[in-house]
Amino acid sequence: MPGYEWIGDKERDQVNQVFDTGILFRYEFKEERKGVYKVREFEEKFATFNGVGYAQAVTSGSTALKVALAALGIKPGDEVITQGFTFIATFEAIIEAGAIPIPAEIDDTLNLDPYDFEKKITPRTKAVIPVHMLGSPARIREIIEIAKKNGLKVLEDTAQALGASVDGRRVGSLGDAGTFSFDFYKTITTGEGGMVITNDKDTYIRASEYADHGHDHNPAVGRALEGRSFLGFNYRMTEMQGAVGLAQLERLPEILDVQKKNQEKIRNLLANMKGVQLRSLPAGGVDSHTHVCFFLPDSQKAADFHKKITSAGVSAIYFKNNLWHFFHNWEHLLSKSTAWPGSFPFCETFCDTDIDYTSDMLPKTEQYLSRTIVLPISLKLTEAGIDKICGVLESAGKTLL
């Protein structure tokens, strides 16, 4: 994902406006900041881009998940279903909320399988987190329909799919809330940072207060006199991050256009290559063009194909062996090793769920990932670079497939 690839004068100009005021904190200092509220402006423009009413900036995509879970009322002992192919932060945020993550299978979108999600629902299930992995939407319509039927909250983890859409609506905007990441390897970056979006005012207010020690942000009084109705924590974004985010958000339409152009030729080649199957897009789905993901006939061919193209200088990922994105490889989660005594929240005091995490509990996910190759798409790809990638892929296909 591009993020860090385009950093320059736009970002520098925005940050300098913050330095000119001397106010790096997002709240207070009305006179000194001279009308410069970078985080607030970033939130407003990000909400507009995604077609929602509200956005709350936070310190990371990981904390965005935690804040959103708190805002949605997830509590200790609740079960939250999510997919076994995701960055580990999705599971960590559920555990941080005191809830129990229930792993579910993926399908040929490389995202949550709606049918397995439905099978995993129990009376303790309170939410589902579909993750739009590697720039492409999950089958979000089906997931939302199942969730509504069972009275569950839908939290879209959109860290890797900013700009993707389903039926003309941005992913992240379709569920009860959506979260985004702005770390160095996301579509836009603030170095570190995240966002929670929602169309529900009460969810937004709870997120806003929880992310700022419970402050109710009453404009009629000074910050020191603001009220609070519950305990929160500090997940505030700084004005410098907000400034960089504004500049990056301004670039986003061009980023998506360039990514699409760079992706197209590679994708078309693979779509017509014998033995190759592109990942599926749900009906009405448009991806964010950050990757090309494809399946090979079996795991051995995938491993050989990956070895051949990477040895020829093509950047590619074989996620079956990835230590941070596949449930199968998280030995600390499999052993329920948390930082708290008694392995909270899995201890009997809080948890009625007797779940045994095993490395073989998601066979369908393992089967898909063992056959999957992922090609990151750089903003800086030249025509010559694209032609080189296509040539290497074509050669590997002729030799191995």
Give, region by region, the residue ranges found by the protein language model.
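Conserved PLP-binding active-site segment in aminotransferase class I/II-type PLP enzymes
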Residues: 1-71, 75, 96, 121, ...
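Active-site region of PLP-dependent enzymes
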Residues: 29, 34, 161-167, 174-291
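PLP-dependent aminotransferase-like
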Residues: 70-158, 165
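Short, conserved charged micro-motifs
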Residues: 299-305, 382-387
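Conserved PLP cofactor-binding pocket of PLP-dependent enzymes
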Residues: 215-223, 265-269, 306-372
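Short amphipathic alpha-helices in soluble, non-transmembrane regions
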Residues: 207, 303-312, 389-393
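Conserved PLP-binding active-site segment of the aspartate aminotransferase-like
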Residues: 280-283, 289-299, 319-339, 371-382
